[in-house]
Design a protein with these regions (language model features):
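Class I S-adenosyl-L-methionine
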Residues: 1-17, 27-124, 129
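Short, conserved loop/helix-junction motifs that constitute active-site signature segments
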Residues: 34, 53-54, 168, 192-198
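Short gly/pro/ser/thr-enriched loop/turn and capping motifs at secondary-structure boundaries
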Residues: 47-48, 66-68, 125-129, 146-149, ...
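Class I SAM-dependent methyltransferase SAM-binding "motif I" and its flanking Rossmann-like core
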Residues: 97-171
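Hydrophobic alpha-helical segments, chiefly the membrane-spanning helices
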Residues: 208-214
């Protein structure tokens, strides 16, 4: 059963579900799910993780697959506030980590504005877990002391991009692009890396997609 709140204001947990493998869910995330009255979950959350929630907890699918959002972000923000005001324990379940390109910051802002108690539960980001499961260390003492994580899918309503792909391409260290499959050709064209640079740094290129979700 979820927690009883006696009509008092509830609480919202912004929970990172990790990169897909249910075994990588944190203990704190599991505790939050076990106490949930409502779970609002994303496309990238492994369905098995929902089994930690009470059988009578309401499950609401928010989508978040590329541009296919079951619930637009503004409406989603309002929903989290509404459910919490009703006195419910709400778990907002997100793939990876809520604050790594997960729009958790936007949701936290709206909850704070509405005076809703909330807590951030970090999750393991696919930016490090994906490469690790593929046998790729994102840092190495002998050859890589820098890690750059960037998105391949910026807000389309922005007037100008804040990412300079050409500079990222020339930088040392490991580069991890998230949400970039649909933008792969565009980004690689704008991220020129000379063959001399590749040979000098023994650089390898890898595409990792849905590694821990299937």
């Amino acid at each position: 059963m979820g927690k009883e709140h006696n009509n008092k204001k509830g609480i919202c947990f912004l929970v990172g579900a990790g990169p897909g493998d249910p075994g990588l869910l944190t203990l704190r995330a599991k505790e939050c799910l076990e106490s949930a009255d409502v779970v609002v979950y994303d496309y990238l959350c492994n369905p098995e993780i929902l089994n930690h929630a009470p059988s009578d907890a309401e499950k609401i699918y928010a989508g978040k697959k590329a541009a296919d959002h079951a619930i637009p972000q503004d409406e989603l923000n309002d929903l989290l506030v509404k459910l919490s005001i009703e006195g419910k324990t709400v778990v907002r379940l997100k793939g990876g980590d809520p604050y790594v390109f997960g729009r958790g910051g936007e949701e936290a802002q709206e909850l704070k504005k509405a005076g809703i108690p909330f807590e951030i539960i970090p999750g393991i980001s696919s930016s490090v877990a994906g490469p690790a499961y593929a046998g790729i260390p994102v840092t190495h003492r002998d050859c890589c002391s820098q890690l750059t994580i960037f998105t391949g899918h910026e807000d389309p309503t922005k007037q100008d991009s804040v990412i300079d792909y050409s500079k990222i391409g020339q930088a040392d260290g490991t580069k991890v692009m998230l949400m970039g499959v649909g933008q792969l050709e565009k980004v690689t064209n704008e991220m020129p890396v000379s063959y001399t640079h590749l040979r000098a740094h023994e650089t390898s290129l890898h595409l990792v997609c849905r590694l821990l979700l299937e």
